[in-house]
Amino acid sequence: MNRTIRVSAAGDILIMKRLLPGYQDVLPIREFLMQGEVRMANLETTISDGSCYASAYSGGTWLTADAKCLEDTLRYGFNFLGISNNHTMDYSYEGLASTISELKKKDVAYAGAGKNLYEASRPAILDTTAGQIAVIDICSTFENAARAGSQTERQPGRPGLNPLRFSEKYTITEKHAQDLAKIAEVTGINGLRDLHRQEGFIAPLPEGVMEFGGKMFEISKDGTEGRSSSPNPIDVKRTVDAIREAKMTCEAVLVMVHSHEIRKDNDEEADYFLEEFAHACIDAGASAVIGGGTHQLKGIELYRDCPIFYCLGNFIFENQYVRLLPADYMEKYGLNIHTAASIGIARRQEQSSHSLYEIPEVYRSVLPYFEICQGKCTHLELLPVELGMDRENAEKNIPYVADEKTAEKIAEYLTSVSKRYGTEWEYKEGRIVLHA
């Protein structure tokens, strides 16, 4: 029997305050999302009452929101929230436990983090009229202490997120390699790592590879120079195995991935390792890969008739409304540790030469609705949304259905960033669709 699986999705939900009482666009957005039986997004904050210990690190800003904000998030109709992102461990193990507890209270399916690596990498299972759908969530942007660890027969696992590690390699000419070697010699930049390598604490360098400041360089054989990246084979295998296992009992598998990495010097191109990972997921049997992270849209690829959304951008982006920040943040920006969070955020804005809040693309996104039959995408449409860049402060940073002029700009931009994947987009009758 050929069953049709209906999925709708949104990007990153960084919610810090309640939705406005008079906010009406929740209704048409909810109506669009409710077409899907699986309705998914990334929850890019912890949920707590603010009493959890802050980690010594954060995903950029320490984020935690009240449970009432989670209630408002669910007004859009989401029944799955990914929790694997660079803010998962902003408030340490206690913050993660609080987030999971609140999601369970609301009976919301989640994946991407847990008490150990098994739980963090385990898919959520959603029941639909087409059968059970598995959703895996994974993240490539994190402090190493944030990743979940495996349990053994001797020790418990470590709470954290489901990690997608990756390696980078820089290819340079022989002349540039000699220059780096000379700089390393006179500065001692590699001294400690060289010593640790001799003592066996760091693995030996592969043949033909040199290190400089923790980065790996390979001498080019043909004179070309550049950067490449590849996903960690252990993390790829764990994910591929989870996809294949889920396919044994589920009608479809979806993979959500959170990644802030970039290919060169802008947020428009997916990193090399992310493309390789997404393709591996589809090759293993996943029906779609849904990405987030870089706060603006990336390209959409149809790979083997399955959609890959490399980044859906923002759905709610209220980073400037953070209500609590630890002393670590204030010290970083030269402020008294008792300074109010709003002043701390303002200080960071003052130091920025290219603020996210001044970039139109940060305020524009799409919500995909797609249908899957026999593992392939048979229908795909996008609802263009904007986050109120030109509205009053109280109305900013939450989604509104885009007007025709803005929607056409979104379609044009999406075509530009999707060019490498051969997909073109046009705005037609309130939706963005593939150009015929």
Show the residue positions of the predicted features:
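Acidic, metal/ion-coordinating pockets
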Residues: 1-436
